[in-house]
């Protein structure tokens, strides 16, 4: 189950996508559908079929974003978070082999297209929550447990 949390930046990104789809792309595609429909036979009209399909995709995404944004809770930075890993933190970790990772713990709807973001619901994020610099986080993986040490914690203020 995904936790309905999002950073302010993530919420603004979703809002911009919704605005773009609803105010710019959808009206443009609607015009193309109308134009293609006016050409006659729709069964063999590739422009009509493609744009009709695109319109359905846009409408599906708009419905998803609208419903999703109603249920999301924006989590802003709080000074009480300083020094510990919480939602929205940039965390640098290192394992026993010296491998280092740096990522931000964010909501499910923010991770797509970003390799440096992980979901708050991931095993790694759950293991890191409330840890401080120097703490050991034991992460359950499909092949057993992995040990990671917290090297740094930063917040976007």
Swiss-Prot record:
Quote the function comment for this protein.
Necessary for efficient RNA polymerase transcription elongation past template-encoded arresting sites. The arresting sites in DNA have the property of trapping a certain fraction of elongating RNA polymerases that pass through, resulting in locked ternary complexes. Cleavage of the nascent transcript by cleavage factors such as GreA or GreB allows the resumption of elongation from the new 3'terminus. GreB releases sequences of up to 9 nucleotides in length.
Q: Name the source organism.
A: Salmonella typhimurium (strain LT2 / SGSC1412 / ATCC 700720)
What is the similarity comment for this entry?
Belongs to the GreA/GreB family. GreB subfamily.
Q: Which GO terms describe its biological process?
A: DNA-templated transcription elongation; regulation of DNA-templated transcription elongation
Stored InterPro entries: GreA/GreB_C_sf, TF_GreA/GreB_CS, Tscrpt_elong_fac_GreA/B, Tscrpt_elong_fac_GreA/B_C, Tscrpt_elong_fac_GreA/B_fam, Tscrpt_elong_fac_GreA/B_N, Tscrpt_elong_fac_GreA/B_N_sf, Tscrpt_elong_fac_GreB
What UniProt keywords are attached to this protein's entry? DNA-binding, Transcription, Transcription regulation
Q: Which PROSITE patterns match?
A: GREAB_1, GREAB_2
Gene Ontology MF terms = DNA binding; RNA polymerase binding
What parts of the sequence cross the membrane?
A: none
Q: What is this protein called?
A: Transcription elongation factor GreB
Record Pfam families = GreA_GreB, GreA_GreB_N
